[in-house]
UniProtKB/Swiss-Prot annotation:
Belongs to the cyclotide family. Moebuis subfamily. It holds the Pfam family Cyclotide. There is a cross-link at G1-D29 (Cyclopeptide (Gly-Asp)). This is Cyclotide mela-6.
């Protein structure tokens, strides 16, 4: 399936494809 967002942003970046930083958690783009 698709990767799940939800990791903590690191310096404003998310490493899961298709996710963006909604500080402090990554959200689906």
């Amino acid at each position: 399936g698709l990767p799940t967002c939800g990791e903590t942003c690191f310096k404003g970046k998310c490493y899961t494809p298709g996710c963006s930083c909604s500080y402090p958690i990554c959200k689906k783009d």
